Amino acid sequence: MDTNMEDVGRVPAELTSSNFEPTTIPTLDGWIESLMNCKQLAESDVQRLCEKAREVLQDESNVQPVKCPVTVCGDIHGQFHDLMELFKIGGSCPDTNYLFMGDYVDRGYYSVETVTLLVALKIRYPNRITILRGNHESRQITQVYGFYDECLRKYGNANVWKYFTDLFDYLPLTALIDNQIFCLHGGLSPSIDTLDNIRALDRIQEVPHEGPMCDLLWSDPDDRCGWGISPRGAGYTFGQDISEAFNHNNGLTLIARAHQLVMEGYNWSQDRNVVTIFSAPNYCYRCGNQAAIMEIDEHLKYTFLQFDPCPRAGEPMVSRRTPDYFL
């Protein structure tokens, strides 16, 4: 079959919304300005935004190529004001190229504003920002951990939740920086040996309960060798022998991932084959951790920038208490 592996896993062009008028740059800039001030968009504007974003994302690969320099970020989890701090530390978009590794929603109080802003930036500067899918970019998880309830509270119905969760199906699963640094939300899978295995996946679906797509968003590195059962109930744990072999076989120097709270914002593991980056400081407004982002320059040299929570007077009360289990 004469198919380029780069194109496998993409959505056919005929699925593009044909009756959608392209959003003008002044309109987008107005939306972004409003969102930067933590003001939510009207429901109809969110619908237009998500339709346009789908057109952009459906052309991206399951292993989206990214060029240096770029700044790599971990979980945000609706902590909007800390995202503003991240941009203050790392530079504004599009002055800085960004790669976000998923988990934009749930837990924090401003999931709506956070994910809307990142999606708007993606449409406005598609070659300057890459947004990957995390395990929380899912219909099932967001109904339990806050995003669904927040949408109901802020819009009075579930339409905005549906627009975004439908869009999440189009997010790339992984990214590859200059063919050397492999970025994804969770970790490796026993079903995947090569990047071409990932390119061959059909990603346009809800995150499955098991299988390679699930594993990429749920797995974690572990001190024990080989594959292990994950305490999360999805994905696997994988040892240094697994990450070393994967990096060697695919010509990689590093796996960068998010998904786990690390107290200093970043953490090397598995003899520096893997680095975990977490970008939500004082996670859930109580964990006391620092956050970090990883700056990669044009020579593939990386620097970690750590930051603390943005000072703020207080946060609004949430309508229900979310479960304690940290996903």
From Swiss-Prot:
Enzyme kind, highest EC tier: hydrolase
Keyword Metal-binding: yes
Taxonomic superkingdom: Eukaryota
Cofactor section: Mn(2+)
Gene3D superfamilies (UniProt xref): 3.60.21.10
Gene Ontology annotations for the cellular component aspect, listed alphabetically: cytosol
GO biological process: mitotic cell cycle
Annotated InterPro entries: Calcineurin-like_PHP_ApaH, Metallo-depent_PP-like, PPA2-like, Ser/Thr-sp_prot-phosphatase
Residue numbers bearing the Leucine methyl ester modification: L327
Keywords of this entry: Hydrolase, Manganese, Metal-binding, Methylation, Protein phosphatase
Recorded catalytic activity of this chain's protein: O-phospho-L-seryl-[protein] + H2O = L-seryl-[protein] + phosphate; O-phospho-L-threonyl-[protein] + H2O = L-threonyl-[protein] + phosphate
EC number(s) given by UniProt: 3.1.3.16
Cofactor: how bound: Binds 2 manganese ions per subunit.
GO molecular function: metal ion binding; protein serine/threonine phosphatase activity
Residues reported to bind Mn(2+) 2: D103, N135, H185, H259
Protein name according to UniProt: Serine/threonine-protein phosphatase PP2A catalytic subunit
Lineage, broadest ranks: Eukaryota, Fungi, Dikarya, Ascomycota, Pezizomycotina
